From Swiss-Prot:
Primary residence: cytoplasm
Protein name: Translation initiation factor IF-1
Quaternary assembly: Component of the 30S ribosomal translation pre-initiation complex which assembles on the 30S ribosome in the order IF-2 and IF-3, IF-1 and N-formylmethionyl-tRNA(fMet); mRNA recruitment can occur at any time during PIC assembly.
One Pfam family here: eIF-1a
Protein localization: Cytoplasm
UniProt keywords, alphabetically: Cytoplasm, Initiation factor, Protein biosynthesis, RNA-binding, rRNA-binding
UniProt-recorded Gene Ontology molecular function terms: ribosome binding; rRNA binding; translation initiation factor activity
InterPro entries in the cross-refs: NA-bd_OB-fold (IPR012340), RNA-binding_domain_S1_IF1 (IPR006196), S1_domain (IPR003029), TIF_IF1 (IPR004368)
Provenance organism: Streptomyces coelicolor (strain ATCC BAA-471 / A3(2) / M145)
Ranges for domain S1-like: 1-73
Function comment: One of the essential components for the initiation of protein synthesis. Stabilizes the binding of IF-2 and IF-3 on the 30S subunit to which N-formylmethionyl-tRNA(fMet) subsequently binds. Helps modulate mRNA selection, yielding the 30S pre-initiation complex (PIC). Upon addition of the 50S ribosomal subunit IF-1, IF-2 and IF-3 are released leaving the mature 70S translation initiation complex.
Annotated GO CC locations: cytosol
Gene (UniProt): infA
Length: 73
């Protein structure tokens, strides 16, 4: 998995599935962010459901939005 320069990776739990492959994710610290699925996960048809544990990559510029890069089994 390629790491993005300056991106913050944090674990969270999917709370709600939204339209257009967006998800509301509650992070370990209690904050909720809006996240979309990374392209590799979309390409390999990895499904994400509510209550899944995921790793979210946050940009240092906007900490309210992120990208889901991994789903725990």
């Amino acid at each position: 998995m390629a790491k993005k320069q300056g991106a913050i990776e944090i674990e969270g739990t999917v709370v709600e599935s939204l339209p257009n492959a967006m998800f509301k994710v509650e992070l370990q610290n209690g904050h909720q962010v809006l996240a979309h699925i990374s392209g590799k996960m979309r390409m390999h048809y990895i499904r994400i459901l509510p209550d899944d544990r995921v790793v979210v990559e946050l940009s240092p510029y906007d900490l309210t939005r992120g990208r889901i890069v991994y789903r725990y089994k």
